[in-house]
Amino acid sequence: MKRENLHQPFEISFSELAESLLKEHEHTFFELVYILSGTGIQWINNNMFPYHDGHLFMITPGDTHSFEIHTTTKFVDIKFNDIYIHSSV
């Protein structure tokens, strides 16, 4: 399984993906995934969560997750790590 790292304290990205399967992977950081549009399934730690417009998911360090994208989906990803949290307190 792929393990992703974040090389800066904070990052925001927008993406649009057509029907596909995004393989299961793990993070060393926090990620907020906001669904702007589209439908599919988000798998988090082997739990299935159908999604559609307006859904928000929080992925924490060590969680595994993947997507089954059923219709073209637009995402907003907000990624941050412990350094960002500690510097904001």
Give residue ranges: language-model regions.
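Generic protein-terminus/edge-of-domain signal
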Residues: 1-56, 69-71, 83, 89
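Glycine-rich, highly charged phosphate/nucleotide-binding loops
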Residues: 59
